[in-house]
Amino acid sequence: ITILAMRRAMEDAGVDPADVDGLVIDPHTTTGAFWPADKPLPMDVIESYAQTDEPLDGITQLSAEWILKNTPELTGVNFTMNGVGCMSRAVTVAAQAIGDGMAHTCLVVKSWHNLEGRYYQGGAAASNETPGTAAVRGLWGTPACFGTALQFAEYCRKYGKSHDMMAPFMENSRRNGLMFPEGYWAQHRPEELTHEDYRAARWIAKPASLFDNDIPIMVSAAYLFTTAERAKDMKQKPVYILNHASSRGRPRSLTPTLDEVEEETAATGRKIYEGAGITADDLSFENM
């Protein structure tokens, strides 16, 4: 699906693969589980692709070497870099690479695998021991959403809000997802989310319920970044990136408090405006 996503991105942009000179990836594709050491490797799948020294390349991880070996039409790539973490990090690495002149046409791809179909069914979660500082963080079995759930609980107390107020937002998010033909919901579960569904959902980490969490899927997304000069002649109307920014504050404890999150978010927003040379009055919409 990684190779397919990349090829579709180039086709959608009307770009000749030979013109691509940059590649940014996230080498990590796991959603919590890794290939068990005692489980036989799927050699039939592995051997159907050009291989690297790491047999699980293309199965439970990615490398630029594996991608280039299996996408022979990418003949002009001379810049590769990893953007580790969320898709947003890989995207900003690609944007900065274009801005710094390290490439003029750059593919960026992020893939996720979840072979078990559930989160955290392998790796450390399958172990009988919790080593090192993980014992402090994970001994009580908190799910991945608990940090955000704690912050949301603080938000509700601070501003007099409730979990139910999120229902219209979540209903609209599902509605938007159903209008995205490439997405999971449109392809596999074309069903609306109702207010009653949302309110009746079981808690995962109160006040975060089932529908406040994402769903484990196998997916790959690819985007193409290029210079403004080249973008004007491509098939699709381009989106121009004015700036990107982040904030790297250190929380006082294991999970950032709401006050810390609000402070860092505000700092990021100010950096975005300053670097882009605009103010809030220039925005026609907000996406947060």
Task: Please name every model-derived segment.
Residues M81-W112, C145-E182, Y223-E229:
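Active-site-proximal alpha-helical scaffold in enzymes
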Residues P27, T31-T105, H113-G147, H188-N213, ...:
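Conserved catalytic cysteine-centered active-site region
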Residues I1, R8, A134, A167-E171, ...:
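Condensing-enzyme catalytic core mediating Claisen C-C bond formation in acyl metabolism
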Residues H163-M170, M179-P181, E192-A201, K235-Q236:
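Acidic-enriched catalytic cores of C-N bond-cleaving enzymes acting on peptides and small amides
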Residues P17-P27, V77-N82, C106-S111, D164-N172, ...:
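Beta-strand segments within the central parallel beta-sheet cores of soluble alpha/beta enzyme folds
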Residues I1-R7, E11-A13, P17-T29, I46-Y49:
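N-terminal beta1-alpha1-beta2 module of alpha/beta enzyme domains
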Residues R7-D21, Y155-G160, T268-D282:
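Phosphate/pyrophosphate-binding loops at sites that engage ATP/ADP/AMP, CoA/4′-phosphopantetheine
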